[in-house]
Amino acid sequence: MPSTPADAKGLLKSAIRDDDPVIFIEQERMYGNKGEVPDDTDFTVPLGVADVKREGTDATIVARSLMVPVALKAAEVLEKEGVSCEVIDPRTIRPLDIDTIVESVKQTNRVVVAEESHPFCGVGAEISAEIMTRAFDYLDAPVRRVSGADVPMPYAKNLEERAIPGVEQLVAAVREIAYMD
C-alpha cells in the first residue's frame, strides 16, 4: 500500500514482475498527491521491505498508505514537545517486514499502530499481535492502536474525514503511551 508516488511506481513494478499472485491496493484519496518519482525505468521497491520514514528514539509509529503523511505530521508536532518519534511505513502487508518494526520497538520501547481501516480484524490488529509476541519484554507501555471509526466508510468527504484518524488522534495516542497525559 504505497504512501508516496515513488512507492506507487516501485511497488507496482515489483508486483507485476513477481512470479506469485499479488493484490495491489491503492488509496483513492492519494491519487492527487505529488512527489518525486525516479525516471529510471527499472526502478522498483522490493516487496516485504519497510521504509523508516523518520528516525526517532522515544516512540514508534507504524503507519501505512494514507496514514503515513498523518504520522509524519504528528511526529513533527510531538518533536516540538520533546518527543522523538520513529515513523515506519511497512509498504506491504504480505510479506510484512515485522523485523524492522520490532527492531524499532526494541529501541523506542513504545509503539502506536495507525491505520485508516476498521479496528476489528484490521492489519493493525495483526501488526499489534506480532509486536506483542516478538517484543513484549521491550515495551514500557501497551501497544496503542489508532484506527478508523467502526462505521461503513461514508462517501461524503466531510463524513469520510471524520471516520479516518487525524494528527490529533495520533498525537494523543503517543502522549498516552509516553505517559504525558
Feature-to-residue mapping (PLM):
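Conserved thiamine diphosphate
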Residues: 1-18
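Residue-level detector of structured alpha->beta connecting loops
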Residues: 19-20, 109
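Short, surface-exposed beta-edge/turn micro-motifs
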Residues: 20-21, 58
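Thiamine diphosphate
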Residues: 28-181
